[in-house]
Amino acid sequence: MTRTAVLLLTLLFLVAMAASDKIKTRELCWSERECENGK
């Protein structure tokens, strides 16, 4: 694979991880502030 392809895959992976973390935080309500706002 070329370096460009590796960089693109790495960026996509990081974006996917960040997006999944936000979704988990909203669903499981790990943040106290979000829990209070949810109530």
UniProtKB/Swiss-Prot annotation:
Protein keywords: Disulfide bond, Neurotoxin, Secreted, Signal, Toxin
Tissue spec: Expressed by the venom duct.
Subcellular location: Secreted
Disulphide-bridged cysteine pairs: C29-C35
GO CC, one annotated term: extracellular region
Signal peptide: 1-20
Record keyword Transport present: no
UniProt GO molecular function: toxin activity
Comment, domains: The cysteine framework is C-C.
Function summary: Probable neurotoxin.
Name by which UniProt lists this protein: Contryphan-Cal3
Organism annotation: Californiconus californicus (California cone)
